[in-house]
Amino acid sequence: EGEIVGFLGPNGAGKSTTMNMITGFIEPTSGRIIVDGYDISKKPRKAKRQIGYMPEGVPLYSDLTVKEFVTYMAELKGIPSKEKKEKVKKVLDATGLAEVSNKLTKNLSRGYKQRVSMAGALVGDPKVIILDEPTVGLDPKQVTEIRALIKELGKEHTVILSSHILSEVSQICNRVIIINKGEIVAIDTPENLENKVVNENSVYVTVEDPENKMENIKEKLEKVKEIKLVNENEDKTKKYIIKAENEVDIRKEIFETLAKEGITIFEMKKADATLEDAFMKLINTEEPIPNEESKKEGGEE
């Protein structure tokens, strides 16, 4: 509760199947899915009332107003009539839709349509919110607004966010689950996953080297493991990545050695890993990579 979890995997990994099982659209062939204490196979109605699902593609009824659509979703969820009006108003206010509540959904911008779909998922105050690609197709301003809304939701709900935009997941998620070929290959914070990729200290340097001295500079750098040309720029400068052992800061040695050799440094910066780097490494690994959380949980999934 109060956590935003990123759910990642390459195409065909099983993300959609997993979400369809959690939301009760597909019956699992084995194992159990427990939502707030309810087994979705044995008590589907009670389990589904704990879930708000916003599918990709924003499926709305174009002939309904915003308020009518959210009210209809409240009726489908079995919210009592005496509570319905108040709960609909609550989610319209929370999602910033009060001012457009009487507009037909077909006349809204894509950003507002995303909000309406999210309001439909939120009505009834479910414990778990599942969002499938909530910012796809939005302009930068709309993306910022939806991300801010998701962060607010994460304060009171468990939010499961499926997205192909890894920078988005890194920014707003507390934890990340990565699956590949139907198997969980990692469960950790974005920061820890990024740190696991950096098993060596790497530095990018952009230099002016007309005499190609960089080709033989490695033997003069004691702590350096590898030097690799990244690209040659139009201004005839060259960008290299220089790798050393983990926890070794090689920037001073690089600066002093290159200066001594007469190689002009235009730029030098540490190469930081991203969630995308971690994702690519994990999905290209044959065996699931163990992590501290999975070791602690250890039991039945």
Named regions from a protein language model:
Residues 1-180, 185-186:
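ABC transporter nucleotide-binding domains
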Residues 30, 46, 68, 83, ...:
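An acidic, carboxylate-rich microenvironment
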Residues 72, 90, 219, 256, ...:
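Surface-exposed charge patches
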Residues 96, 225-231, 264-269:
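A short linear hydrophobic-aromatic micro-motif
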Residues 245-301:
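C-terminal coupling/interaction segments
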